[in-house]
């Protein structure tokens, strides 16, 4: 019997989101497509309230908010709660301008001999993820972002989003399929040993530009990202919803 060839619908996967503004800010492979949610929400009444009990990267919440709806989503992972809040928040022109002005300040911190990096996270065999030069750069950059003086903490959020993009981009992890693997360490080196800081700075600068390019695209609706266990929804949300969209397994 001839095998049936099934064409992959990339437009229903995370790849469709890559260049769609805030949806592409930070890629996590299992994320599903914006198109999927838009099609499901399309027939809702104007005052509909949307629930996603498994937020993930908050694709549902952001889609609903962009279409003017009220959305709530639940996530047990604190980092994903932070990411969902960052993606669905409003950013003022002042916040965006302040953020863009920090590139030079961060560069000065990175090049300062007195700059002290944050401690690297206690990951087993961390050099399997980042080479020593990259790890040193990332630890100094994180310290700079943490300590830079800002009047608006939303600016720090944008700086951290760009940091996450750079951290993933410069890692040895390969995200081209669902089960993560590692790149060949011999082919990993993007840059030579000399002036690696300057090259890494360029990567971060480009990632920050990408984040800022859609930061002003504030959603017209609202989204609440709740840190909690979706098995106990009745303790986390106390009102009814018109549509429930759950993440795919």
Residue ranges and their predicted role:
Residues 23, 27, 74, 128, ...:
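Short, charged/polar micro-motifs that form catalytic or ligand-binding hotspots
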Residues 17-19, 119-124, 179-183:
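Short linear capping/connector segments at secondary-structure termini
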Residues 1-46:
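S-adenosyl-L-methionine
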Residues 77-148:
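Conserved phosphoryl-transfer catalytic core
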Residues 10-16, 58-59, 80, 112-118:
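Short amphipathic alpha-helical segments, especially helix-boundary/capping motifs
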Residues 135-246:
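SAM-dependent nucleic-acid methyltransferase catalytic core
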Residues 29, 33, 80, 134, ...:
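Hydrophobic (often cysteine-bearing) scaffold residues that line and stabilize catalytic clefts
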Residues 33, 39-109, 196-235, 243-249:
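Conserved S-adenosyl-L-methionine
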């Amino acid at each position: 019997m001839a095998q049936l060839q099934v064409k992959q619908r990339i437009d229903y996967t995370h790849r469709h989101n890559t260049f769609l503004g805030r949806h592409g800010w930070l890629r996590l492979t299992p994320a599903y497509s914006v198109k999927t949610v838009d099609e499901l929400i399309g027939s809702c009444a104007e005052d509909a309230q949307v629930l996603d009990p498994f937020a993930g990267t908050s694709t549902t919440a952001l889609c609903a908010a962009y279409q003017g709806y009220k959305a709530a989503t639940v996530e047990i992972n604190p980092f994903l709660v932070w990411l969902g809040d960052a993606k669905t928040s409003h950013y003022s022109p002042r916040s965006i301008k302040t953020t863009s002005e920090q590139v030079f300040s961060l560069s000065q911190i990175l090049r300062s001999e007195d700059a002290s990096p944050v401690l690297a996270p206690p990951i087993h065999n961390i050099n399997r993820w980042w080479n020593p030069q990259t790890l040193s750069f990332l630890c100094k950059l994180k310290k700079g972002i943490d300590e830079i003086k800002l009047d608006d903490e939303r600016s720090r959020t944008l700086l951290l989003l760009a940091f996450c993009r750079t951290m993933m981009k410069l890692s040895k992890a390969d995200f081209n399929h669902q089960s993560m693997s590692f790149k060949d360490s011999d082919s990993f080196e993007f840059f030579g040993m000399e002036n690696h800081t300057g090259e890494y700075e360029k990567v971060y600068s480009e990632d920050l530009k990408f984040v800022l390019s859609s930061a002003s695209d504030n959603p017209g609706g609202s989204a609440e990202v709740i840190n909690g266990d979706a098995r106990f929804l009745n303790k986390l949300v106390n009102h009814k919803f018109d549509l429930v969209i759950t993440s795919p397994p």
